[in-house]
Amino acid sequence: MSHDRPRARRDTQSRRGTPVQPDAWTFFRQWLRNPRAMAALSPSSRQLAKLMIEQLPEGAQHIVELGGGTGVFTQALLDNGIAPEKLLVVELNEELHQLLMRRFPSVHVVCGDAQELKAIVRGSGFTNEKSGVDAVVSGLGMLSMPRATQRAILTGVFDVLREGGRFIQFTYGPASPVS
């Protein structure tokens, strides 16, 4: 008589049979490792990404995304017609950076600190000093960061935006992340 035990589920279902979101698990693991750096328990929703993308300036082509995470905004940008070679994603977390590179091989994904945005954009050859980028889309948890970090990031953002470019940021909190 065989005593086969059921195998542990490591795929797409939990013990209760509900779907497991691999991106949500990856994101949550990173949050457990460094909650202050992640600033959120789970990735942004597709609905939020859609609302953010609707704020892009008309005809936007060169886009920088800060805090690419699991790629929710990245996918929305690509779905909205942004060419992969016109998208630069900056992600500080090494594991999420690797995930983004695998998921979006045609997109320029950089493992770097948003505080160094100007150097990242210039160093990557993504745009030149005169033209700037059309928009910066950010999912960073700005309100969980020290003021000096916020200032450094915002300085970099406004240094790389073209005249008339747009900074698109969301936050969960009682105050604007940009003041």
Positions of predicted regions on the chain:
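Conserved class I S-adenosyl-L-methionine
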Residues: 60-69
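Conserved SAM/SAH-binding beta-strand->alpha-helix loop
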Residues: 93, 113
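Conserved SAM-binding loop
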Residues: 100-101
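A short SAM/SAH-binding and catalytic strip from SAM-dependent methyltransferases
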Residues: 133-148
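A short glycine-rich, Lys/Arg-flanked "PGG" loop and its adjoining helix->strand segment in the class I
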Residues: 151-163
